[in-house]
């Protein structure tokens, strides 16, 4: 869904780097490893959090139930 706030293994905060990571890959055409090097993500446990993440938030939004009192 969304990137976890911290690395599951070491606890380092990583979520603040997600948008810059996506920008480096999509807009600047960098390889994922190069983007992580530039962001200073050097621990393999933190790198796996980025490399294995699948962003499914947009795909799941149509299936969320409407909230009570909210217009449809």
From Swiss-Prot:
Pfam families: RNA_pol_N. One of its GO terms (molecular function) is DNA-directed RNA polymerase activity. GO terms for biological process: transcription by RNA polymerase I; transcription by RNA polymerase II; tRNA transcription by RNA polymerase III. Its main location: cytoplasm. Its cofactor is Zn(2+). InterPro entries: RNA_pol_su_RPB10 (IPR023580), RNA_pol_suN_Zn-BS (IPR020789), RPABC5/Rpb10 (IPR000268). PROSITE patterns: RNA_POL_N_8KD. It is an enzyme of class 2 (transferase). Coiled coil: none annotated. It catalyses: RNA(n) + a ribonucleoside 5'-triphosphate = RNA(n+1) + diphosphate. Keywords: Cytoplasm, DNA-directed RNA polymerase, Metal-binding, Nucleotidyltransferase, Transcription, Transferase, Zinc. Zn(2+) binds at residues 7, 10, 45-46. Binds 1 zinc ion. Its EC number is 2.7.7.6. One of its GO terms (cellular component) is DNA-directed RNA polymerase complex. It is found in: Cytoplasm. Part of the RNA polymerase complex. DNA-dependent RNA polymerase (RNAP) catalyzes the transcription of DNA into RNA using the four ribonucleoside triphosphates as substrates. Belongs to the archaeal Rpo10/eukaryotic RPB10 RNA polymerase subunit family. This is DNA-directed RNA polymerase subunit Rpo10. It comes from Methanopyrus kandleri (strain AV19 / DSM 6324 / JCM 9639 / NBRC 100938). The gene is rpo10.
């Amino acid at each position: 869904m969304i990137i976890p706030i911290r690395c599951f293994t070491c606890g380092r905060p990583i979520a603040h780097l997600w948008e810059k990571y996506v920008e480096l890959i999509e807009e600047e055409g960098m390889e994922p490893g190069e983007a992580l090097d530039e962001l200073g993500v050097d621990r393999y446990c933190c790198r796996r959090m980025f490399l294995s993440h699948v962003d499914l938030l947009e795909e799941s939004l149509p299936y969320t139930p409407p909230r009570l009192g909210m217009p449809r």
